[in-house]
Each structure stands twice: as C-alpha cells, then as structure tokens.
Amino acid sequence: MKLLKIIGIPMLAVCVLGMTGCSSMNNTGKGALIGGGNGAAIGAATAATIDTAAVRDSISAIISGMPGEIGVAAIIDSRDTVTVNDIDKYALMSVFKMHQAIAVCHSFDLKGIPLDTILEFDRTSLNPDTWSPMLKEHQDAHFRMPVSELLRYTLMQSDNNASNLMFDRLVSVAETDSLIATLIPRNCFRITERESDMQSDHAKSYNNHSSPSGVARLVERLFTDSILSTEKQEFICETMRGCHTGADRIAAPLAGKDGITIAHKTGSGYINETGILTAYTDAAYITLPDGTSYTLVILVKDFAGNEKQASDIMARISDTVYRAITRNKPNN
C-alpha cells in the first residue's frame, strides 16, 4: 500500500466530451429529453417498451398539490426517458458524494494511484458535531485509513467527515465540479460547497444543485458507460449497492422482491427556521431479474412536510415506475 500524506492534488486533466444542454441527450442513440418543462417523455427511435406519457402523467398526478417542488427523471434500459418538473435547480445534498467519488477515482486513475492507498489524519481534524459514523466507529486519536474505506463511508453511510477530508486532501470541490462537467452538461448542475460549508451556512445547500435529468445522466453513465478504470468504476457501483441510507424512499416498494438489485445515493436537507425541509433526494440504478435496468432520480425541494411524508411520495413514484416497467412481464 502507498502512504498518502498529500495536502492537495493538481487540477484534474479532463477531456471535454462536447455534450449539449439539458434539453437533449447525448448522441449515442440512447434516447432524448425533449423540452424539459413540467414533464417531457420520449423513447428511442425503436418502439417504446413502456407508455412514457402515461408514466409521466401518473407521476404528475402523485406530486400535484404536494407542499413542495418535486422533480423526477427516469431512464429505462438506456432508452426510454421520462422527466417531470425537470426545469428547476434542486439541492443535491449528499447525492453529490457520488459525484465526489467519481472525481476521486478519476484523479487516482490519472496518477496510477490505487484505492488502498493509506491516508493519515488526526481526530482533531474531524468535526464531532456532524453526521459521521466513521468518527463513532473509530476511537483512535490518529487515523490510518485506505481511501477506499473513506469512499465506502461516504457512499454507504453518507459520512460528512470522510467527504470533507477527501475534498480538503485529495480532490477539491472545484476540481470535482470541473470533472463532472465533462460527463454531463454544464448547465444541469453545479457543485461549489463542502458539507462543512453547508453546515456553517445552511443557505449554501442550494449552491450544490442539479436538475433531476442531470443526476440521471450521471448515474446512467456510471452504470452503463466507461468513465473510469474498470476496477474503480465497479468499486463505486458495488459500494452504492450497499448504501445503508434511505431504505424508505426509492427502495421501499422494491424491498423483498426476489432478484432486484438497487444501487443508490441519498441526501437529506436541513429544516429551516420556518419548518421547511430544504431538500430530500435519492438517485438510484435498479436492475430487475430479467436484466431490465433503469435509472430513477427523485429530488424534493422546499417541502412543507416531514421526512416521512417526503419518503412516502418518493416511494409512490418509485412504485409507479416499477409497475409500468413490469406490467407486461411474467412473474412480476
């Protein structure tokens, strides 16, 4: 193993992929997002596998009249696409840790650094007043931890200290933002804040934002394209399959169903002074027993309700998409 005591890594060398804005998918023939507005759906040139318009209408009916803004994007088998309320900027919250993991792995790929490289840091450099399973599980004054373990803490348990540490010591917020802009359209997202920045000023949570389709594009590329070395890309995907958070959101209606795998990353916002839940998010890649796969992203913004109510809405949307996909399949 290598011992890593670096303070920073130079700006990532990136190759711009020439992707267009949020209103159109890439030119690989994997479908298109047309319009965006309050709901757009279109399949690929081949016959659609589901009635995308009906799915869009069903989702719109679920979120109609809800006390907040709810945006949805679904991509089925890299082809059929449904979006609802895709035009706004939704706070990502900890969903951005998926973006961060991609940037860290990309940087390590460029430098030929393995993920079992050891990072050393002191307990005094960590925040005891933030969400951090890592800090609770390790009581030592001095830490020696492989970067792979830091990534597991961020992706599986959404650890804020692990995320802050990697931004400060490995790949900065600005570098992460720049790298992701080579993978999805620039106007779909922005990442400018660490967890520590948002904790000190909750209003900064809105600065890390995305459209639902922006997140969906990134999830889709992560699970279906080659954007990293095989080893590191598979590491992120497998780690997201072990996500411990948000079981009552997109995953809820899929629980207990044989042969379904779900990889996802969730985020939870702050409650502001007026009792509004600033954000509640989930981004998932789901594979069914017959090999059908789909990406589903649900972003909730400024919700005048509690987390359980937001989770219930997300679960209903997830169930709607699942039922539409499996309606004509046997044994579902």
How would you label these PLM feature ranges?
Residues 17-21:
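C-terminal motif of bacterial Sec signal peptides marking the signal peptidase cleavage site
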Residues 23-53:
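Short, low-complexity, glycine-enriched hydrophobic/amphipathic alpha-helices that associate
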Residues 48-89, 270:
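Beta-lactamase-like hydrolase cores
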Residues 51-60, 168-169, 173, 221-260, ...:
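Structured C-terminal helix/loop/strand segments within mature extracytoplasmic catalytic/sensor domains
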Residues 69, 143, 164-227:
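Mid-domain, small-residue-enriched loop/turn segments at the edges of structured enzyme/sensor domains
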Residues 91-121, 154, 296:
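Active-site SXXK
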Residues 106-126, 173-177, 229-233:
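Short, well-structured active-site flanking segments
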Residues 126-164:
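Conserved catalytic neighborhood of penicillin-recognizing serine enzymes
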